[in-house]
């Protein structure tokens, strides 16, 4: 039939205009390689391998991470100890996977706390009146002006944080200020929308409006900050442990492994510093790469509206 015939180039130009070539390419089903184009595939693959190794650390590790092999102190990388041993005789290869598990848990838990506090606080400030909004934002700016590391050090000393949960909570409650400002800005743009006003008029509670109408409309805008918070939490834990103010020595993390750096420099045992540092840097770079990809996708989405 005539309706089923294929349009010529001239007829297609009349239908969709000068962009007929783009229209024709969009109609064609994309191949697997085209779907992966522009995506941080290598970063996602590396991060997947690291996370997989940390999750199944008991399978990947070939030595007891808490074992002290006193006959092999500061042994360089070799057949028995793939990544060598530290000054306490512990197998670095096994410590990497068990320590990565702790660091990733702190990163995810701290990010969850940052997200919950930042989103809730930003929604309250964005929907509140001018006076309440001004007070809430001044408080955020005041807290944000204090160096984050200083706040964490003060809270760690006061609360005597020395376990994974408490360290994650402290990092979380001191890192939500930037996210709250972004959420507040997004909420103020949509708070007078018809669907939000209708939900309020129908008696919808603040929690209902926030969960069903506010968050779905700005979640894409905060994904970069949320993903970047994972690397920030891991970095902060490593910094605290490196300074001797984080997790105790018996709790293995990448940061606590790097806390032996001063001894390693004196004794010229480079593998004690380099190997945990490489895993930490690769993980942070992969997370940052994924966050940058999400931000570029969001920017492209808004620029095409």
What does each model-identified segment do?
Residues 57-60, 106-141, 153:
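Transmembrane-helix boundary motif in ABC transporter permease subunits
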Residues 90-105, 109, 129-137, 191-192, ...:
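Amphipathic cytosolic juxtamembrane alpha-helices at the membrane-cytosol interface
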Residues 163, 174, 227-228, 269-305:
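C-terminal transmembrane helix and the adjacent membrane-cytosol boundary/short C-terminal tail
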Residues 4-8, 53-87, 243-252:
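Hydrophobic alpha-helical transmembrane segments of membrane transport/permease proteins
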């Amino acid at each position: 039939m005539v309706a089923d015939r294929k349009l010529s180039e001239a007829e297609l130009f009349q239908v969709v205009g000068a962009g007929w070539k783009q229209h024709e390419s969009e109609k064609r089903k994309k191949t697997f390689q085209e779907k992966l184009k522009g995506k941080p595939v290598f970063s996602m693959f590396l991060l997947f391998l690291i996370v997989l190794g940390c999750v199944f650390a008991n399978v990947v590790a070939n030595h007891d991470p808490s074992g002290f092999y006193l006959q092999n102190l500061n042994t360089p990388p070799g057949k028995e100890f793939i990544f060598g041993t530290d000054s306490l005789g512990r197998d670095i290869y096994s410590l990497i996977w068990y320590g990565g598990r702790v660091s990733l848990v702190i990163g995810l838990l701290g990010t969850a706390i940052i997200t919950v506090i930042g989103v809730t606080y930003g929604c309250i400030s964005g929907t509140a009146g001018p006076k309440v909004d001004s007070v809430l934002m001044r408080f955020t700016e005041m807290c944000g002006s204090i160096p984050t590391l200083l706040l964490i050090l003060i809270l760690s000393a006061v609360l005597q944080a020395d376990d994974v949960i408490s360290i994650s909570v402290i990092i979380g409650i001191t890192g939500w200020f930037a996210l709250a400002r972004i959420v507040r800005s997004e909420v103020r743009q949509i708070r007078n929308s018809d669907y939000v006003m209708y939900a309020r008029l129908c008696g919808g509670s603040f929690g209902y409006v926030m969960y069903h109408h506010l968050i779905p409309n700005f979640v894409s805008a905060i994904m970069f900050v949320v993903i970047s918070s994972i690397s920030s939490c891991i970095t902060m834990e490593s910094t605290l442990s490196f300074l001797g103010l984080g997790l105790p020595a018996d709790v293995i993390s990448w940061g606590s492994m790097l806390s032996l750096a001063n001894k390693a420099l004196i004794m010229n045992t480079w593998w004690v510093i380099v190997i945990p540092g490489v895993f930490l840097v690769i993980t942070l770079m992969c997370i940052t790469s994924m966050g940058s990809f999400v931000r570029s996708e969001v920017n492209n989405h808004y620029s095409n509206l």
